[in-house]
Amino acid sequence: MIKVAQCWDDGVATDIRLVEILRKYNAKATFNLCPGTLAEETVKPFWTDPVLHTGWSHNGFRGGAVGKKDLKAVYSGFQVASHCWRHETAGMIPDADFLKAALDARNFLEDVFQQECRGFAWPCGKHTPETERLLAEAGFRYGRTTANLADVTANENPLALASSCHFHNWQFWKIFEEAKKTGVFYFWGHSYEMMEYPPLWERFEQKIKALSEDPEVEWVDVIDLPDLLRRNQSAPGTLS
């Protein structure tokens, strides 16, 4: 058996299309949200002129944002995690302000979804020893980075959690096959990276379908990974 986890960042409106695919194949996922960036109403994805537009875009594409009033409808049944209040970056603001941003997002999400929210994804993948310590003391169980690790079970610090790969990695299936040796495969991404390009969405759905139909695959949530890591470290070579 291999345990597979996935997570998606930023709460963009392209997640609406994403969750349809995940629900179709009963795939678990965690969504890392920044409540302070969300309007009350959903903002649809749109294209910009990459030359004239001065704000951020992904090759001229903006993924929009799920509105606060639609959060439960879109993400119900999935795990949600703090991605800070407005995507604040560790090391770029005072540590106390960063901790407040992480907790404000967590408290908001727990209130909306009425479920415990102890997961975290580091905005821009940036983290420091001090912010790791602060989040651990605040009760966060993990902090996902943007680093990759061939053996996810070898993560020594859940507050600096590396994944197997990005979902667009051209060696996705090779990495998955290698991960079978250790029993955990973990990928992440942003749904806006598929833009409105049908081949990318079709390829993604094929991945989810193949994983879900693999009798050796068990979907797990990212919040499950710290326990799996500890269990693996206490009993090398075994994952139940």
Where are these regions (language model features)?
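Boundary/entry segment of secreted carbohydrate-active catalytic domains
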Residues: 1-14
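Hydrophobic "anchor" residues on beta-strands that sit immediately upstream
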Residues: 5-6, 79, 217
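Glycan-processing catalytic domains of CAZymes
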Residues: 7, 82, 142-144, 153-173, ...
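Short beta->alpha connector loops
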Residues: 10-13, 123-127, 165-169
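Aromatic/hydrophobic pocket-lining residues that form the small-molecule binding cavity
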Residues: 15, 98, 102, 172, ...
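A short acidic, amphipathic alpha-helical/loop segment
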Residues: 17-21, 130-134, 174-175, 207
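C-terminal domain-boundary segment and adjacent tail
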Residues: 24-26, 110, 141-150, 189-240
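Metal-dependent polysaccharide deacetylase catalytic core of the NodB/CE4 family, i.e.
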Residues: 25-133, 149, 154-159, 184-194
